[in-house]
């Protein structure tokens, strides 16, 4: 099956003149809750953080100066725009139904046609994930056609930094090969439009030997790279010699000399380690990096090997030995690159070397000798100041600019670094690196808050804590200490907006750190609560009374607990089922609301959160969905609730009512009225009249306008938040494209 993935049709081409009768019929049949006007156009931008997620692969185009691409594990793919010095996102057109395609397993370029780019898209292989697809573009990613595959991909699974699995025949661009995790090798002969499995491919690619043990059990890794040997063929004809690498410690490298019909093991190859990358020099020599595991979670051993097909010889050129201190601090080799202008110039990266740190090694003699680069480097953090606290790690790919030998790129778990002066480094200078990440936003925000005073936005972010965003378009440092690892929940007092709480996790937690923090100045400074509740594992959800005098915290794996002195003493909240979501009324200090997804029941407290009683319900809608409660900012006793396929609900005057027209409610937020004296604007990520999208209503949910468009859907949208001070502005979190904000055009 093939579908087109393109932006919206220009408005001038949507229709010609409509007969008056048909217009009348349409006006009668239009659902009353839909706005009669056209959808409201919005301008969308990322809140500037800079990186924040694992960039898993890089590619320069070999014949087009300034053209490069990057892939990520959960945030889609990007193209570098040399004129603006920014990365351009290519996959924002995917909506919630296709959010699984935001994880890019592999990317491939046609070396003879700079306009063609291919993506293997699919994030997970678990039972609930959808199948993957191959996306192909003839306009550098401005639009894609999609070929659905009959199997799943793992762009955010073990081995995601290996590659590339997807390859274009350099002599005949119609031919592509794709190495899969558990389904062997697949081939296309029509620029990726149709695919078939290659028969006779080595069975080890589908075996248990090509799996690896992760934190949640075994995962298939399979074929991790496919490489055509361009010198074995000629333009216009299929390349006969092809290499394929399998992630196994057994025989792992295979070659075909007849265009992929027959395969045999390459003789003399090393065993006992898994290959992750294979790169060809202009002299026909190949270089392979190895680890005992595919990464990125772990890699404890590894090597770098040189293979010369002309003589059939293999040479171990590993730049640095393993530690011999017996401390279990071994490391692997994550990537290797060859300078396209000089086959003797190599770069290779360590992987998971935490003592003393990961490094990149450089050779100018084909691997006979090496110099560590990062140990003699300076890093410019000005583009994203928060990166100063993060050393390079998970260096799973390296690329050398084919037009500029001074520039190399390497990926990390939080973005892309670029060098300025590699040739000067060879002459004794310190290497200079800058964070080449503008436009590439890959954080996974877990909660957002737009207060009525102070900074326009505060965030809680996975892996990197969170930020006070005083200027949405300028990167900044994370929150001042104490620091969290995952920021997971953030809330403020409705009538004391500068009083803010946040909760999260702390990695390694060596000093029994308290995982709840309070700020009295809108997030500028923070202090820890006095203690945690006697049960739970931190994180969870926090809410604070309208007057700021009582806080309810529901840590992970615990019930709800209330404190009146920021953790000096805790009391267990009564009357709530496990897992209920809680929010404080924004006006009445004694009132709290709780919503339980398992039963669909709403609970209300009128005694300051000490106890709750059931007040209504809509029926069960699934414990897989996290409902939201949004009390109205200036009216006591009124709140909105999201209930998945049960729709959008409003609690008012002691009654729970389902708002008409909203078929599915994923997330919502409240913002400033669009008109002076009007009702708060509701922003909704959900389904209205059969169409998923981002909507707004300034009529208490009676009418809705869609405000996203077909080119800007950002995969999964969550934690929708209106701005209480700026009419029309909305913020939301994504599943890997950072924080997005929009304003009416």
State where each predicted segment sits.
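The N-terminal extracellular segments of secreted preproproteins, especially immediately downstream
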Residues: 4-5, 28, 604
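Local alpha-helix boundary/kink/capping signal
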Residues: 10, 14, 25-26, 143, ...
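Extracellular glycan-interacting surfaces
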Residues: 18, 36-745
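N-terminal secretory signal peptides that target proteins for export/translocation
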Residues: 1-17
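Bacterial N-terminal signal peptides
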Residues: 21-31
């Amino acid at each position: 099956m093939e579908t087109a993935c393109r932006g919206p049709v220009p408005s001038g081409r949507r229709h010609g003149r409509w007969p008056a009768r048909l217009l009348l019929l349409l006006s009668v049949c239009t659902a009353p809750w839909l706005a009669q006007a056209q959808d409201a156009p919005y301008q969308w931008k990322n809140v500037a953080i800079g990186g924040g997620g694992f960039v898993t692969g890089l590619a320069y185009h070999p014949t087009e100066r300034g053209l490069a691409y990057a892939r990520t594990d959960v945030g889609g793919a990007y193209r570098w725009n040399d004129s603006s010095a920014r990365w351009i996102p290519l996959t924002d057109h995917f909506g919630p139904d296709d959010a699984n395609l935001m994880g890019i397993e592999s990317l491939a370029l046609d070396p003879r046609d700079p306009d063609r780019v291919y993506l293997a898209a699919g994030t997970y292989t678990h039972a609930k994930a959808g199948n993957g697809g191959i996306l192909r573009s003839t306009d550098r990613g401005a639009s894609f056609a999609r070929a659905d595959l009959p199997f799943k991909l793992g762009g955010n699974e073990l081995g995601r930094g290996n590659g590339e699995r997807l390859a274009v025949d350099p002599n005949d661009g119609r031919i592509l090969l794709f190495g899969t995790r558990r389904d062997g090798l697949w081939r296309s002969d029509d620029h990726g439009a149709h695919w078939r499995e290659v028969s006779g491919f080595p069975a080890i690619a589908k075996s248990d030997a090509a799996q690896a043990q992760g934190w949640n059990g075994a995962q298939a890794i399979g074929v991790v790279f496919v490489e055509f040997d361009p010198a074995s063929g000629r333009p216009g004809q299929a390349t006969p010699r092809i290499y394929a690498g399998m992630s196994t410690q057994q025989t792992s490298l295979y070659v075909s000399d007849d265009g992929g019909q027959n395969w045999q093991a390459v003789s003399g190859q090393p065993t006992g380690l898994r290959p992750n990358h294979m790169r060809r020099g202009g002299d026909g020599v190949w270089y392979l990096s190895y680890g005992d595991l595919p990464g990125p979670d772990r890699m404890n051993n590894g090597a770098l090997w040189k293979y010369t097909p002309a003589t059939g010889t293999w040479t171990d050129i590993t730049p640095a030995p393993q530690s011999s201190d017996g401390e279990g601090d071994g490391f692997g080799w994550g990537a290797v690159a060859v300078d396209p202008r000089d086959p003797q110039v190599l770069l290779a990266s360590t992987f998971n070397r935490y003592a003393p740190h990961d490094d990149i090694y450089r050779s100018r003699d084909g691997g006979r000798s090496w110099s560590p680069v990062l140990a003699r480097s300076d890093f410019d953090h000005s583009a994203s100041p928060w990166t100063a606290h993060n050393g390079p790690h998970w260096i799973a790919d390296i690329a050398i600019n084919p037009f500029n030998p001074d520039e190399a790129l390497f990926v990390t778990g939080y973005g892309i670094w670029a060098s300025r002066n590699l040739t000067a480094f060879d002459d004794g200078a310190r290497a200079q690196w800058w964070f080449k990440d503008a436009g590439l936003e890959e954080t996974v925000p877990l909660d957002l808050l737009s207060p009525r005073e102070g900074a326009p936005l505060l965030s809680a972010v996975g892996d990197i804590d969170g930020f006070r965003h005083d200027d949405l378009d300028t990167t900044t440092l994370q929150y001042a200490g104490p620091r969290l690892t995952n920021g997971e929940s953030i809330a403020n007092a409705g009538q004391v907006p500068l009083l803010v709480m946040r909760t999260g996790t702390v990695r390694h937690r060596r000093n029994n750190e308290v995982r709840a923090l309070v700020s009295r100045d809108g997030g500028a400074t923070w202090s820890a609560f006095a203690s945690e509740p006697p049960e739970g594992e931190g994180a969870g959800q926090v809410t604070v009374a309208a007057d700021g005098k009582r806080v309810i915290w529901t840590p992970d794996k615990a019930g709800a607990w209330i404190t009146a002195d920021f953790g000096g003493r805790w009391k267990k909240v009564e009357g709530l089922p496990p897992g209920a979501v809680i929010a404080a009324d924004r006006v009445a200090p004694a009132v709290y609301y709780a919503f339980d997804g398992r039963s669909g029941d709403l609970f209300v407290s009128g005694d300051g959160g000490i106890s709750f009683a059931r007040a209504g319900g809509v029926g069960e809608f699934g414990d897989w969905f996290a409902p939201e409660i949004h009390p109205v900012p200036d009216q006591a006793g009124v709140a909105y609730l999201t209930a998945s396929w049960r729709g959008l609900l409003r609690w008012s005057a002691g009654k729970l009512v389902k708002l008409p027209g909203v078929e599915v409610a994923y997330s919502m937020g409240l913002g400033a009225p669009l008109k002076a004296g009007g009702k708060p604007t509701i922003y909704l990520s959900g389904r209205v009249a059969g169409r998923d999208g981002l909507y707004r209503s300034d009529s208490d949910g009676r009418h809705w306008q869609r405000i996203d468009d077909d080119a800007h859907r950002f995969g999964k949208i969550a934690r929708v938040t209106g701005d209480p001070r700026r009419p029309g502005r909305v913020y939301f979190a994504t599943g890997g494209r950072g924080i997005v904000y929009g304003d009416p055009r």
